Each structure stands twice: as C-alpha cells, then as structure tokens.
Design a protein with these regions (language model features):
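Extended beta-strand/beta-hairpin segments
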Residues: 1-56, 68-127
Length: 127
C-alpha cells in the first residue's frame, strides 16, 4: 500500500469588498461574513470589529486544536466553551502611537464536557 503524504503548506485565498471605511465583506471558500465597527466608531454594526474577529479566530483555533488533541489522547469531548477577556491597547488602531503588542493581556478560559478524569483533562491542557 502506498502512503499518502499530506501537504505541509497550503495556499489560502480570501476576497474582501470594502464598501466603507469600517465595513469589510469577506468571502472565503463558499462562506461570506461581514467585519464592521460599532455605531459609536462610525460603523454600521453589521458584524464584529476587526479586533474582535482576531479574538474569534483565537477561539476557533482553540476549539479545533483542543478537539484534535483530545481525539489523539482518546478523550471524549462532547462540548467545549471558550471564553476570552482581553486587554486591548487602542493607541495603535487610533494612530495615537505606534505599539508593538496591541493585546497587553489575553485570558482564555476553556470549559468542556467530558467523561475524562482530572488527570486526563490536565494532560489535554498541557498538550
């Protein structure tokens, strides 16, 4: 039998139309979504702000990787909840000052439903 080697690098494509200074309509694969600013920042509030979208991507990656690692460890995870609280330095996005790290602190909390014991959950957390 021939082993199939998966690609380690793949090309990702995304298109975005920007009908205003705050709204970005994104299309990736066959999925569309809108990134926008809230009304108080001259947006139309049709979607999460760009910085909120970055945190949403972190939540999505946390979910995907945690479930893959759980599967690798043989753990049954029936539900996962990710909660993120971040301290965001707005000076960069307001062009007040150039900053290196916009998120001064990110607290990421994961709650899950599983039949695994605490030792197995701890192993999942460290992986």
């Amino acid at each position: 039998m021939v082993a199939i080697r998966q690609k380690t690098t793949v090309k990702q494509r995304l298109e975005a139309d920007c009908p205003s200074q705050s709204r970005t309509d994104v299309k990736v694969r066959d999925v569309s979504f809108t990134i926008d600013e809230p009304l108080e920042r001259d947006g139309t509030n049709m979607g999460p702000a760009p910085t909120e979208t970055a945190l949403a991507a972190l939540a999505g990656c946390t979910n995907t990787i945690a479930n893959k690692v759980a599967h690798k460890l043989g753990l049954d995870v029936s539900n996962l909840h990710v909660s993120i609280v971040a301290d965001f330095d707005r000076r960069g996005v307001t062009l007040t000052e150039e900053i290196d790290v916009p998120y001064e602190k990110i607290e990421l909390r994961v709650e899950l439903d599983t039949t695994a014991g605490q030792a197995e959950i701890d192993q999942l957390a460290t992986e």
